[in-house]
Regions:
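Intrinsically disordered, low-complexity regulatory segments
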Residues: 1-47, 54, 58, 70, ...
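Intrinsically disordered, low-complexity regions enriched in serine/threonine
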Residues: 1-9, 90-97, 102-273
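Short amphipathic alpha-helical segments
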Residues: 15, 44-51, 144-147, 151-154
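Functionally constrained cores in energy, signaling, and assembly domains
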Residues: 20-21, 30, 34-35, 59, ...
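Amphipathic, interaction-prone secondary-structure segments
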Residues: 46-112
Length: 273
């Protein structure tokens, strides 16, 4: 199952401290939207996302990343889709930090959605957990605030399972052939046709820093994720011209690739266990 929301290119901000309201207003003004879009019916319960964020803050959840999709219709800018990544007090620093991913819009294109994720500091990778860990959806009706708060705690309860799987992956060694297979599977997720991939599996599994030279499943996955999301790898197009892989700048694409890579990693974990 894919996310209902579809995002294009976006404005974003990430800090290694709590984001302020001024920063949110500058980069994600739709969080402060004063009303629903005119296309929404009377049954649509409108609550500004900032109200939800403030209630989550009261519960100890703080935003560290925020982004908003760009729209061609300026009349929809105040209602456009946005995403925030929040951390719980007491789980702010570390090599890998659990995050709650909150998505919403006020133009009818998205319900509130909450998905478990992980932020990895060494490479600033923002991971998204696969569907097998679950995600929470809250429609724009009824007690939205209460349901979102409840959903945040449900996602929080998933993190123990996420951490257990992550630690298990760190203990699984992959030989060169297995790493090549992981890279090949990842390329198929993005390009679908092996004949159209501009780079090789060897390139996609190559580390960008010495900390990522380990051969365990977790680190292999991180190398692949960073190379795919950030792009910049030299390769050849289907027509044989020199090219560079593009960074994935759309949130929908980021979510899709991240979820698919998590599924691949889970399959390798089960296969090697």
């Amino acid at each position: 199952m894919r996310l209902a929301s579809r995002f294009g290119r976006y404005n974003s901000i990430r800090r290694e401290r709590l984001l302020t309201d001024d920063e949110l207003m500058q980069f994600v003004p739709s969080v402060f939207s004063g009303d629903k879009h005119e296309s929404r019916s009377e049954r649509y319960t409108y609550i500004p996302t900032i109200n939800i964020i403030n209630k989550l803050r009261d519960e100890g959840f703080q935003p560290f990343f925020a982004c908003q999709s760009r729209v061609r219709d300026l009349g929809r800018r105040e209602y456009s889709k946005h995403m925030l990544r929040l951390r719980r007090e007491g789980h702010i620093n570390g090599q890998e930090v659990p995050e709650i991913i909150l998505l919403n819009s006020h133009d009818g294109s998205s319900s509130y959605q909450m998905i478990p994720g992980i932020f990895r500091f060494v490479c600033t990778n923002g991971l998204v957990c696969g569907n097998n860990f679950g995600e929470i959806r809250v429609p724009h009706k009824g007690d939205i605030v209460g349901q979102v708060i409840e959903g945040a705690y449900e996602v929080l309860g998933i993190f123990d399972k996420v951490t257990d799987n992550m630690e298990a992956m760190k203990e699984i060694h992959l030989n060169s052939d297995e790493q090549h297979l992981f890279g090949r599977a990842a390329l198929m997720v993005r390009y679908e046709d092996e004949n159209k991939t501009p780079v090789t599996p060897e390139q996609i599994i190559t580390p960008r820093r010495w900390e990522d030279k380990q051969n365990d499943l977790w680190t292999t996955w991180q190398r692949v994720q960073e190379n795919m999301i950030k792009g910049g790898l030299s390769g050849r197009s289907a027509s044989g011209k020199n090219t560079r892989t593009r960074a994935i700048t759309g949130i929908d694409g980021d979510i899709r690739i991240n979820k698919a890579l998590w599924v691949i990693a889970e399959q390798f974990r089960k296969w090697k266990s």
